[in-house]
């Protein structure tokens, strides 16, 4: 994805002081280095941070409120054309948040989307992240 110059953002409603250590630990476990070198923007719940720093640009509400994804797209990733955005989610709240933001959703099986009856809000459902490469 990075080789194709596609921007990647991470949006989590988890509070920055809890979410960031978990994200960093996952990257270390997978020998992936610093998440800031992978993601072009990371938005979390919590206090305002500087652009390029871990955390939030100032998220005001958690999912399913659309702010987290609109903030990620327009402020974090500097998107100018919303038709170039696609969201990937495994949670019902995330699907609603993306749809409220006006972005299409690819649902990742394994979360609670199907159990919540929200499959119909996803433009596509996949079992593994690798399947996303065929979509983009």
Residue ranges and their predicted role:
Residues 1-5:
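Catalytic-core regions built around general acid/base machinery
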Residues 11-12:
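Conserved beta-strand/loop elements of the cytosolic catalytic core of P-type E1-E2 ATPases, chiefly
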Residues 15-136:
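Asp-based, Mg2+/Mn2+-dependent phosphohydrolase catalytic module
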């Amino acid at each position: 994805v990075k080789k194709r110059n596609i921007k990647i953002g991470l949006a989590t409603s988890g509070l920055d002081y809890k979410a960031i250590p978990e994200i960093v630990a996952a990257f270390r476990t997978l020998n992936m280095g610093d998440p800031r070198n992978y993601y072009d923007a990371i938005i979390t719940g919590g206090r305002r941070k500087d652009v390029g720093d871990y955390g939030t640009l100032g998220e005001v509400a958690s999912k399913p409120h659309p702010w987290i994804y609109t903030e990620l797209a327009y402020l974090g990733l500097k998107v100018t054309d919303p038709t170039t955005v696609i969201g990937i989610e495994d949670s019902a709240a995330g699907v609603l948040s993306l749809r409220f933001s006006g972005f299409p959703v690819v649902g990742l099986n394994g979360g609670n989307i199907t159990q919540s009856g929200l499959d119909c809000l996803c433009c596509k459902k996949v079992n593994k992240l690798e399947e996303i490469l065929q979509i983009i």
